[in-house]
From Swiss-Prot:
PANTHER family: RIBOSOMAL PROTEIN L25/GLN-TRNA SYNTHETASE, ANTI-CODON-BINDING DOMAIN-CONTAINING PROTEIN, RIBOSOMAL PROTEIN L25_GLN-TRNA SYNTHETASE, ANTI-CODON-BINDING DOMAIN-CONTAINING PROTEIN. It comes from the Bacteria. Keywords: Ribonucleoprotein, Ribosomal protein, RNA-binding, rRNA-binding. Part of the 50S ribosomal subunit; part of the 5S rRNA/L5/L18/L25 subcomplex. Contacts the 5S rRNA. Binds to the 5S rRNA independently of L5 and L18. The keyword Oxidoreductase does not apply. GO terms for biological process: translation. It holds the Pfam family Ribosomal_TL5_C. One of its GO terms (molecular function) is 5S rRNA binding. This is Large ribosomal subunit protein bL25. It comes from Endomicrobium trichonymphae. This is one of the proteins that binds to the 5S RNA in the ribosome where it forms part of the central protuberance.
């Protein structure tokens, strides 16, 4: 994972009007939490955060720059506005750079399969991400797989993925990632998603589309609950 710095400022849990004003001023309300850490309400620059996501994707170590120093975190989940798709809330989960964590890493397909190029087959993606375990700095931004040799009826499983230093695949080794099928099979099985390139499974981070429900801070303030930590390789409970 790459490392970036993002300034974070403390904020109070206010009303929906306060949150709307915060967003109009170019800030995104967020929560910083983790195992043994009291959740902190913070705000970050919308412009800087969006540029970080566009340049690095979700798998990036974000060193939140507080007044009392930097704290390492990853993006656990995002809330997006239903109409504009703008990010309106972020969950930052605290991490230790020395402890292993489990995250989803996107799989990148390199080349055009022989069965597609020369025999009219269709590439069908079963999963687009795989779960790995590693210390944060060893987690790759993506995992590349060469599919040029694949013929119709052949595929790639987790067991076929390249070995990476310090990285362990924690999904079942027999999990099928991508395969090449005949066009006839696509119509017989009624899988229009195969023609469109397949569908993704769980994404990292989780994206929540807001349809006008109460903001997360309002719900937390009313319920008086704390934000739980997700499971890592060193223990904890998943959010």
């Amino acid at each position: 994972m790459k490392e970036v710095i993002l300034d974070a400022q403390a904020r109070t849990v206010g009303s929906k009007g306060d949150l709307a004003f915060l967003r109009k001023s170019g800030k995104i309300p967020a929560i910083f939490y983790g195992k043994g850490i009291k959740p902190e309400a913070i705000a970050v620059s919308s412009k800087v955060f969006v540029s970080i996501m566009e340049a690095n994707g979700a798998n990036v170590i974000i060193n939140l720059n507080f007044k009392d120093g930097k704290k390492a975190a990853i993006v656990k989940s995002l809330d997006r506005d239903f109409l504009t798709q703008h990010t309106i809330h972020i969950d930052f989960h605290a991490i230790s750079l020395e402890d292993k964590i489990e995250v989803l890493v996107p799989v990148h397909i390199a080349g055009v399969a022989d069965g597609v190029k020369n025999f009219g087959g269709v590439m069908e993606f079963i999963v687009r991400e795989v779960k790995v375990e590693a210390i944060p700095r060893n987690i790759p931004q993506k995992i590349s797989v060469d599919v040029k040799a694949l013929r119709i009826g052949q595929g790639i499983t987790v067991a076929d993925l390249p070995e990476l230093d310090g990285v362990k695949y924690v999904q079942d080794s027999s999990t099928l990632i991508v395969h090449v099928i005949a066009v006839a099979a696509v119509f017989e099985e009624e899988k229009p998603e195969a023609m469109a390139g397949g569908t993704a499974t769980v994404v990292q981070p989780e994206v929540i589309i807001s349809k006008g429900k109460k903001d997360k801070e309002d719900e937390e303030a009313e319920k008086g609950t704390s934000v739980a930590s997700p499971t890592t390789a060193t223990g904890g409970t998943k959010k």
